[in-house]
Curated annotation (Swiss-Prot):
It comes from Colwellia psychrerythraea (strain 34H / ATCC BAA-681) (Vibrio psychroerythus). Belongs to the methyltransferase superfamily. RsmC family. It comes from the Bacteria. One of its GO terms (molecular function) is 16S rRNA (guanine(1207)-N(2))-methyltransferase activity. GO terms for cellular component: cytoplasm. The gene is rsmC. The lineage of its organism: Bacteria, Pseudomonadati, Pseudomonadota, Gammaproteobacteria, Alteromonadales. This is Ribosomal RNA small subunit methyltransferase C.
Amino acid sequence: MSCPMSLSNPSQILLRNSELLVAKVPLFINLPEDGFIEAYTEIHKPDTIHCFNTNFIDYQAITKKHCSPTKTKNVKATFASTYQTTSCHDLVIIAFPKSKAELNFTLAMITHCINDETKIILVGEKKGGIQSAAKLTQHIFSCCQKVDAARHCLLFVGLFQPERLSDVFNLQDWFKKYQITVEGIELTIASLPGVFSQQKLDVGTALLLSNLPSKMTGKVLDFGCGAGVISCFIGKKFSGTNLSLLDVSALALTSAQESLALNGLSGNVFPSNSLSDVNEHYQHVVSNPPFHQGVKTHYQASEDFLAGINKKLNKQGNITIVANSFLRYQPIMETHIGNTRVITKDKGFTIYRAQLS
């Protein structure tokens, strides 16, 4: 069948193999809103499509397109770090994640809602590592067969081993916990598979923590919080702060919440598409801005954040970020916030600070 041009390459290879996708109650895991859901519905007319996304932007797009009061009720969208349902799915389509550990996490997470006849489809771009799908799933699948290769993508079909379906999924088993010490402050960080800098403190964040403002009080926003390292450090060092942490990833948000708890801290942890759901004003904003989406480098979200954050700062509020030195963030900050200083440079990273006048 012909595919609408708006479809991503993985969605196109799925529709090329439409005969494999017949189902009454399918589950789509981390598929984007690119027209595939609509095309699938027209072809197969399922009873209900369940869409589970750990990315808030994809979840918002699916909800807007398919779950508004004026739309049909056969699409159910969920944004969370883990999937819970009373349904039993006869088909699961998984967008192959950039983290191999995240694939194992995802497969373990769905054992409660499938059976040994549930068809599992793995789809993704070759450069994302999907070539290793059969090897990665050999301990959990009874078979995993490559059925198509097209548009720089691969499509695998697998079935679970029945004995694996009895395993009970426990989220706590999947946190990787590690200890770090910065400026004499000891922290315990918890990180789920797929979350940035799992199991260690990255160079950029370490540089940022050593170059924060000398005094911090009031409301602090940690933009792109990941596992919550920055907020945990600030909360421990500056007891007069009120922490808010945002990220686009449900896996990151759950990790950050766990990290706060492990360090005896609390904070407002919430999802946001850049600044879409930021409703407060802050005295301090800190960030190691993310610029990777999936396996692609993508700067727009960080640039939008820097261009819009002035509207979320208190008068005399400041923002401190760390970035790869090759990124041209200083002119954006100068234009939209004000005088922007280079605090330090080291190991390919630069610390910038700007204060709203």
